[in-house]
Structures are given as structure tokens and as C-alpha cells.
Amino acid sequence: VNKYPLWFLLSVYEEANQELIMTDIAQLLGKEAEDLLQHRCTTIPAENLYLPGADFVDRIMIDNNRPNTVLRSMQSLLNHGRLAGTGYLSILPVDQGIEHSAGASFAANPLYFDPKNIVELAIEAGCNCVASTYGVLASVSRRYAHKIPFLVKLNHNETLSYPTQYDQTLYASVEQAFNMGAVAVGATIYFGSEQSRRQIEEISSAFERAHELGMVTVLWAYLRNPAFNKDGVDYHSSADLTGQANHIAATIGADIVKQKMAENNGGYRAVKFGYTDDRVYSKLTTDHPIDLVRYQLANCYMGRAGLINSGGAAGENDLQESVRTAVINKRAGGMGLILGRKAFKKSMKEGIALINAVQDTYLDKKVTIA
């Protein structure tokens, strides 16, 4: 893989830091600023991690068995948008038209019924890539596939079947994604659901084929099981359970793992099922959010597979919440943020500003690895 010249990467990084950072991160974090920006992680040391950087492909991915074409595709992701040359990723995902229904997703901003505007939002916001359904990206692929990297989501839920099922169905093939010029494919597995073992088999095979064709693989490694709600606590975002989902994701060949940011811990103990170890809670984690996400990252082969956290649903304090998530992800050693609903449910101008604020977090040298 041919790297960009060092002078180019440094100039991009320096220019971004000096001229483009406009977000006052500490002010947005408010009372949490000192705790989040000064925290030192003493559970899993940073020196044991494989951290993001401009040389991520040459330093880390070069060890694995991926074809050269996959390394080239990963480098193209890392060299695009405002975060080019940093090793971090800012991804716009808009597959909610299937996952949550088009009406529920786009009624606030009907312009996003048109796939063109989804891609334009990603371009104008300086994202590394745009992730969406096969149909959305295929409908505008000839106009945009050479302007921004495409990530095609291969499988989805559907919300017309009643009662709701925790399942994912293949909507497109790896070959369809490749033929439209995508550099990456993504898929969801609902770990813990009745259909999870079939999903694991399907997506493992799909990722194998994607690598053969030279595409990067991204897994939405989500948990789905009513048993993970226990005594009023939702353990679908528990560090220990999501950590194991991440570990399986890396096992089946995910180059990047998308995971909800850990909000609690002790899911194994609460549901009284599966296997864990007391040292997970006494030595490898604390209650601090950065330490919880650090454990999620450890399960991604210590960062050999990049960890991106999701932005979550739109709400009243989206800017603050998004920057907070980005700070935690970056300081834990993660690779970036994949943020959709918080952006596209606003005007395009507001959505771009929010995405740029998240990117500022990854560009800011003062936000360091804990």
C-alpha cells in the first residue's frame, strides 16, 4: 500500500487543528469536563493497545491476512474527509429508512427521502464515508461513488412484520456492493437473539467474500434479548456483554466494529448466564465511562479491529451528547464515531455543524488517549 507523503499528512493534520477546530469541547462537557478530559486509565494501559493513527494500515493491518486490496480500501477511508490523515473515522449512517421506517426517520426533514441529499450531507460535513442501504446508494452511485467512499449495509430488520422479530435479513449481496464501487460493506448481528447463530454464519461468509473482493468489513455488533433487561436495568449496553459481542465480531472478520457506548457493567452477573471472571470487574474495568469503553476496545483484539461507537437517537442535547461520546471513544482508544439520527433529523446546516463538532474532538490534540 502506498502511503500519502508524510508532509501531506502532517499538513492536513496541522491545518485541521489550527484552522478548523472551532468547538469548545470543555465548555460543552460542562461539569464533566475535568473528569472526562483528565481521567487516567489504570485498568488496561494505553501502551498495550493498537491505537488509531495515520499509519494504522502499515503499523497494524499489515500483520493480518487481508488481501492488499482490503488494505487499499481501508487507506481510502482513512484518507477522506476532514479527518484524513489522522487515523480516525467520521461516518454518516442512514439506514434508518428500513430499520425504523422511512416516515419515522425522514418526516422531520423530507429532503432525505431523496438519496442524493443523504450523500450530499456526508460530503458537505467532511465525513470519511457514507453508509446506507443498497437501494439508497445504488440509486446515486454513478454520480457519487467516486466522490466519497460508500459503505453498503447488507442486512436489515423490517418493521412491518408483527410481532417484532429480533432478526436481520439479507437485502443485498456483496457482489452488488462491489459492482457499485463501494469500498466497504456493513452488517448487523443481533447477538443473544434466537436467530443469532444463523446471522453469524451468514455474515461470516459475506465478510469472507467482501475481503476477496477487496472491501473493508464493518459489523454492527448489537445485543438483542429480553433477558438482558433485568430489575429495571438495560444491560444491552453493558461493557461485559457488549465486549463479548465485539470479540465475536472480530472473530468473524470485522475490520471495524460498531458498538453502542457502554453505559453500565455486570450484565453477565445480572442475567446469571454465560461466563465471566471477577477480574473483569475488579481489575479490567471501573465505573468510569472511559474505562468501560476501553474494555469494549480490548475485546476488539486490543484495537487491531477498530472500535467506533454509535451516536444514538436524536434528543434535546444532541451536540453535548455527541461530543461527550466522541471524547470517551477517543480517550478510550477508539477509532471514531458513526452518527446519523442526531444529524439528519436536523436541518442540513445544523447537521453539518454537529458532525463537524464531533470531528473537532478527534482533531483536537488536547483530547488525548487516557
What is the predicted function of each stretch?
Residues 17-153:
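N-terminal capping/small domains of soluble enzymes
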Residues 303-316:
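Active-site clefts of carbohydrate-active enzymes
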Residues 344-368:
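C-terminal helical cap(s) of enzyme catalytic domains, especially alpha/beta-barrels
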Residues 1, 12-16:
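Acidic, Ala/Val/Gly-enriched low-complexity intrinsically disordered segments
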Residues 105-129, 136-137, 142, 149, ...:
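Alpha/beta enzyme core
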Residues 337-344:
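Short acidic/histidine-rich active-site segments
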Residues 138, 194-197, 315-319, 344-348:
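Acidic-and-aromatic substrate-binding clefts and catalytic sites of carbohydrate-active enzymes
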